[in-house]
């Protein structure tokens, strides 16, 4: 996993809370439901040709696997915090930038790949644009190489 630093997984506080909520739901709702589905399927008799039993057991395996995955992420989570008050771009920063040539303005937050969600304007710290911006400051002009090179000007860096 690329977002492991010293065996820690980089997450925003918001993403950690989402993962904890998902884990709680899996344990308290999904796991309980699938156990009941298995009991119901067992009560139908012969398990060798019981498709409902097989489906429920497969579903249980998927749920248990996801629970273990989430527990591992939580146990290794390191909350990323932007450099408060700094104009330097870091993981967690919200950045507004302008394409120097087209004048197009984009705003997004740089997060870990686990947090990344382009539909919510959250990009991975491993994306080419984030790699070009990390460590730069408000007002800097930076060259980005995504299939072709272009320049952007950092208009604003918000670290909260």
Swiss-Prot record:
Coiled-coil residues: 3-84
Example GO BP: regulation of DNA-templated transcription elongation
InterPro entries: GreA/GreB_C_sf, TF_GreA/GreB_CS, Tscrpt_elong_fac_GreA, Tscrpt_elong_fac_GreA/B, Tscrpt_elong_fac_GreA/B_C, Tscrpt_elong_fac_GreA/B_fam, Tscrpt_elong_fac_GreA/B_N, Tscrpt_elong_fac_GreA/B_N_sf
Keyword DNA-binding in annotation: yes
Keywords: Coiled coil, DNA-binding, Transcription, Transcription regulation
Superkingdom of origin: Bacteria
Gene Ontology MF term list: DNA binding; RNA polymerase binding
Pfam families reported in the protein's UniProt record: GreA_GreB, GreA_GreB_N
Annotated Gene3D superfamilies: Transcription elongation factor, GreA/GreB, C-terminal domain, Transcription elongation factor, GreA/GreB, N-terminal domain
Keyword Membrane: no
PANTHER family, sorted: TRANSCRIPTION ELONGATION FACTOR GREA (PTHR30437:SF4)
Family in the record: Belongs to the GreA/GreB family.
Function: Necessary for efficient RNA polymerase transcription elongation past template-encoded arresting sites. The arresting sites in DNA have the property of trapping a certain fraction of elongating RNA polymerases that pass through, resulting in locked ternary complexes. Cleavage of the nascent transcript by cleavage factors such as GreA or GreB allows the resumption of elongation from the new 3'terminus. GreA releases sequences of 2 to 3 nucleotides.
Entry protein name: Transcription elongation factor GreA
Native organism taxonomy: Bacteria, Bacillati, Mycoplasmatota, Mycoplasmoidales, Metamycoplasmataceae
Gene transcribed to yield this protein: greA
């Amino acid at each position: 996993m690329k977002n492991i630093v010293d065996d820690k997984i980089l997450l925003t506080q918001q993403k950690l809370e989402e993962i904890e909520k998902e884990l709680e739901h899996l344990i308290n709702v999904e796991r309980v439901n699938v156990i009941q589905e298995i009991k119901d399927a067992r009560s139908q008799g012969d398990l060798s040709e019981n498709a409902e039993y097989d489906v429920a057991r497969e579903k249980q395996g998927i749920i248990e696997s996801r629970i273990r995955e989430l527990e591992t992420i939580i146990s290794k989570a390191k909350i990323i915090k932007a450099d408060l008050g700094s104009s330097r771009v870091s993981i967690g920063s919200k950045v507004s930038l302008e394409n120097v040539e087209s004048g197009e303005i984009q705003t997004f937050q740089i997060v870990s790949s686990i947090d990344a969600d382009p539909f919510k304007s959250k990009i991975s710290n491993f994306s080419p644009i984030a790699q070009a911006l990390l460590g730069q400051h408000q007002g800097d002009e930076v060259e980005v190489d995504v299939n072709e090179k272009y320049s952007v000007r950092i208009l604003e860096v918000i670290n909260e």
